């Protein structure tokens, strides 16, 4: 069944979305030099966050300071530039990373980062939470690998964001920053770090003295939803020794020697991270359709990784990364920056590549 034609109201919504996308693209494009300068300044202190990165590498969750640094610098730029364009900063609960208001609209901007080695996070799609879109997502009610399916046509993934706030149009955008992988650098020291934790664990008696009862029983005590007491003790000893220069000379001479050797390795890893220049290889600006544009984007906006509570906007599905209701068929997904060194890699994942300059062009 073919989708109905766009109504005049839907065309007006697409026009406003397109006009704001142009404004956002201009802001980021003209601020790239400032962004790179600020990012370079943050990277001067990479040696101070190298150990936490190493520590997180053995956890199920990964501490990615580069995502956080990028997000904060972009937030700083947008907050100043948006104000100059007449948009007031408007913190809202259940909203995107940044929200703004003017006389006609409420703007949601989500800042996303993706590792170049994880194309599922950026290739032709952008993951969205229920606070990052006003468009209901299609719910696929089946279990993979099993002959179990339900008819969910009447149920969709409904977001927390409304299509309007007090008659002001909701406009949602995503800025996606793709950065180079650095996993192999951390892999060089991961096993050494595990060995250091084991070394400290074996020699805990040097700095941890039992007062009453069994020390081993205390260290193995595990309250529900927490780690064994041993784990945070080791974490704190590592941070105390290598970050705060505490607990020095508390261990035996042989243990101290191994700790000092590991410290030299941390310095070496910090140097390699700095040389990698972990800055965006590409910046992609994406306009996410307003929910009032349904059903025109139903094929592209579906339930995401967290089934029933997230979305994926497949902005390139069937080649339709455009404002469907506009005559100019401008792209909803535009590159604001590409490191030419990575262009051959990016072309494997994006075809065509639409770049924002003063006009759009294809590489």
Swiss-Prot record:
UniProt EC number: 3.1.21.4
GO biological process, one term: DNA restriction-modification system
Reaction it catalyzes: Endonucleolytic cleavage of DNA to give specific double-stranded fragments with terminal 5'-phosphates
Keywords, alphabetical: Endonuclease, Hydrolase, Nuclease, Restriction system
Keyword Nuclease: yes
GO MF: type II site-specific deoxyribonuclease activity
Domain of life of the native organism: Archaea
Name by which UniProt lists this protein: Type II restriction enzyme MwoI
Gene: mwoIR
């Amino acid at each position: 069944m073919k989708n109905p034609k766009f109504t005049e109201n839907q065309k007006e919504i697409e026009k406003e979305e397109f006009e704001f996308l142009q404004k956002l693209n201009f802001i980021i494009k003209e601020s790239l030099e400032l962004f790179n300068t600020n990012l370079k300044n943050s990277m001067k202190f990479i040696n101070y966050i190298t150990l936490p990165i190493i520590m997180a590498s053995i956890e199920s969750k990964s501490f990615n300071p580069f995502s956080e640094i990028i997000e904060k610098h972009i937030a700083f730029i947008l907050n100043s530039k948006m104000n100059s364009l007449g948009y007031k900063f408007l913190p809202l609960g259940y909203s995107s990373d940044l929200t703004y208001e003017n006389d006609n609209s409420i703007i949601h901007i989500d800042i996303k980062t993706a590792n170049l080695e994880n194309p599922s996070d950026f290739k032709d799609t952008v993951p969205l939470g229920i606070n990052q879109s006003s468009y209901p997502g299609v719910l696929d009610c089946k279990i993979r690998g099993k002959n179990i399916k339900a008819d969910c046509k009447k149920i969709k993934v409904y977001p927390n964001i409304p299509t309007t706030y007090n008659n002001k149009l909701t406009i949602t955008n995503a800025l996606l920053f793709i950065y180079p992988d650095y996993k192999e650098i951390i892999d060089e020291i991961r096993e050494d770090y595990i060995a250091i934790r084991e070394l400290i664990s074996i020699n805990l008696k040097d700095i941890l003295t039992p007062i009453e009862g069994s020390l081993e029983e205390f260290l193995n005590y595990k309250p529900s939803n927490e780690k064994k007491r041993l784990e945070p003790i080791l974490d704190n000893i590592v941070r105390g020794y290598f970050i705060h220069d505490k607990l020095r000379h508390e261990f035996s001479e042989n243990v101290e020697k191994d700790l000092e050797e590991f410290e030299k390795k941390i310095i070496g890893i910090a140097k390699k991270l700095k040389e990698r220049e972990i800055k965006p290889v590409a910046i992609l600006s994406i306009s996410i359709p307003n929910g009032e544009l349904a059903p025109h984007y139903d094929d592209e906006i579906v339930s995401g990784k967290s089934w029933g509570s997230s979305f994926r906007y497949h902005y390139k599905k069937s080649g339709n990364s455009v404002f469907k209701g506009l005559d100019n068929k401008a792209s909803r997904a535009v590159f604001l920056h590409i490191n030419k060194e990575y262009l051959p890699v990016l072309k494997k994942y994006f075809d065509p590549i639409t770049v924002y300059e003063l006009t759009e062009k294809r590489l």
